[in-house]
Structure formats: structure tokens, C-alpha cells
């Protein structure tokens, strides 16, 4: 029987006390354990940032990659060994700045991975610059007179790109966060989960209290694209969290004749020929 203790890493997290990433670490570990997935059967990939140190803090296979490039790595791992449960994990700066193109195209392909973004609306590792989700008017080290750029909406991007599972959660509601992650992992196809993760050090606006007053769980038809898109645009007074969109759609691995036939990992190395490799190119 798998327990959450099986996922406890040997390295102690170095996040600031109160960081929303702690709740996400617990939620990811709990979700995998409750689904009966063993550490040896799961992988997490990350880029650069405070949240991207996650592979060091959780006991499963991990790949700490380049800034914004965690999704190509996650996709490659899934294609090489479809039996693995693959999670991509990073921050809003990593995923929505350098990683925007990978985010869009991975969603479009509907690769069977779960992508969790720790969205604190700030660059935390570099001590407080505006990120792609920073709100208009917010003063940061890179926007001392206030941010003049409209924040990016990751949910509408995921929906229009073709993601088959789109959700939002809040680190201040750990049990709900865990359940959303469980649903994302169980979903066959690209699962995107944007998590409000307050940065207690560099973002004094989007705090735990800020989100507690605004978030709510709508009773919605998760098969209805129009409804999901409308909810994804709500922000000012009320912000919906939970699964907004969840539909069945063939995953990339099931549509690719080579990957769906025989996984690369199942071909013995002694028999691996240049012809085999060409099939995967």
C-alpha cells in the first residue's frame, strides 16, 4: 500500500515560511499516494524558479531542466514510456514567459501529462519582478511605477489551445487542491491546473486573505466549453476554482502510430537499431 510518507524526499524544502508551494508539495504527494501510484512509476519535471526546486523535495523520478522547458522534457518522457505518470511543475514566470510556446503546443497536442503551475503572480526567485500574471498597477522591482501590461490569462490560453482538462485551485484550500490534482492525474490527456500560490515575501497584494475573500466553487457543466471559457474570464469580485473543463479527447500517444505501437523503453538496447530511432524522429 502506497502512503504519503513514501513520497517524502530527503531534502528539506528551502521555501519561505508560509509559501504556497508547501501545500502543493503535500497535495501532489497525497494525490499520488491515494491513487495508489508508486514513486517508481511517477516522474516530475521542472524548469527554473522557487517552485521548480520541487524535484529535490519529493521522492520520485525528477528532471530539473532549463527555464520554461519542462513540458518538452515531460512529453518526451511520456512518449518514451507511456506507463509512467508524468507531472510537469513550475511557476508562472517559468511557464508563461519562457515557456509560453511549449505550454500552448503541449495543450494543443493533448499530451497525457499533468501540468501544475504555482502561480504567485511575481518572480520570486529573482526577488520580486513582475511576471506575466502580475496585475495592472502593481509595483514591483521591475515596475516601480506600476505594471502597465495586461496580465496573461493561462486558463483561456489552455482552453483555446485545445487542452482537454482545465482547472484552477488555491494553496489555501489544501484538501480541494489535492482532489483537483487527483482528477488531473486520472484524466487521459493534457491536464492543466493553475494554482493560486501566494508569495508571502514579494507579493503583498495577492495574499491568502485576498483569495479567501474571492474564490468560490461553481456548480458547472465541465463538458461545456462556452461555460468553461466564461468562468475562466471571471476575476474581479469572484474567482472560480475547481475543474472548469473536462472532456474526453484522444491523447497524442494514442494517435501516433509509432508510440501507440511499442514504446521506446520496451525495445531492448541490444536490438535498438538506427531504423528504430528514425521511427521516433
Describe the residue ranges of each PLM region.
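Flexible, low-complexity linker and terminal segments
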Residues: 1, 10, 199-281
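Conserved thiamine diphosphate
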Residues: 3, 83, 131-184
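Short, surface-exposed, charged loop/turn segments at secondary-structure junctions
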Residues: 129-138, 174, 181-190, 204-217, ...
Amino acid at each position: 500500500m502506497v502512503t504519503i510518507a513514501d513520497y517524502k524526499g530527503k531534502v528539506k524544502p528551502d521555501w519561505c515560511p508560509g509559501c504556497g508551494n508547501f501545500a502543493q508539495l503535500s497535495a501532489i504527494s497525497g494525490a499520488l499516494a491515494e491513487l495508489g501510484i508508486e514513486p517508481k512509476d511517477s516522474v516530475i519535471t521542472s524548469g527554473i524558479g522557487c517552485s521548480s526546486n520541487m524535484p529535490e523535495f519529493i521522492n520520485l523520478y525528477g528532471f530539473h531542466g532549463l527555464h520554461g522547458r519542462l513540458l518538452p522534457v515531460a512529453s518526451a518522457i511520456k512518449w518514451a514510456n507511456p506507463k509512467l505518470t508524468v507531472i510537469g511543475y513550475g511557476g508562472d514566470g517559468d511557464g508563461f514567459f519562457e515557456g509560453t510556446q511549449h505550454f500552448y503546443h503541449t495543450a494543443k497536442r493533448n499530451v497525457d501529462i499533468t501540468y501544475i503551475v504555482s502561480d504567485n503572480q511575481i518572480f520570486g526567485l529573482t526577488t520580486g519582478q513582475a511576471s506575466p500574471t502580475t496585475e495592472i498597477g502593481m509595483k514591483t522591482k521591475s515596475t516601480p511605477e506600476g505594471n502597465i501590461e495586461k496580465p496573461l490569462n493561462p486558463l483561456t490560453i489552455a482552453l483555446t489551445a485545445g487542452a482537454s482538462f482545465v482547472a484552477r485551485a488555491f494553496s489555501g484550500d489544501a484538501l480541494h487542491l489535492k482532489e483537483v490534482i487527483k482528477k488531473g492525474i486520472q484524466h487521459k490527456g493534457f491536464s492543466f491546473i493553475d494554482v493560486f500560490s501566494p508569495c508571502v515575501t514579494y507579493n503583498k497584494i495577492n495574499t491568502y486573505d485576498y483569495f479567501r475573500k474571492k474564490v468560490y466553487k461553481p456548480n458547472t457543466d465541465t463538458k461545456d466549453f462556452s461555460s468553461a471559457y466564461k468562468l475562466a474570464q471571471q476575476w474581479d469580485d469572484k474567482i472560480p476554482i475547481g475543474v472548469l473543463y473536462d472532456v474526453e479527447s484522444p491523447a497524442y500517444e494514442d494517435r501516433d502510430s509509432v508510440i501507440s505501437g511499442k514504446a521506446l523503453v520496451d525495445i531492448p538496447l541490444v536490438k535498438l537499431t538506427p531504423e528504430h530511432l528514425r521511427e521516433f524522429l
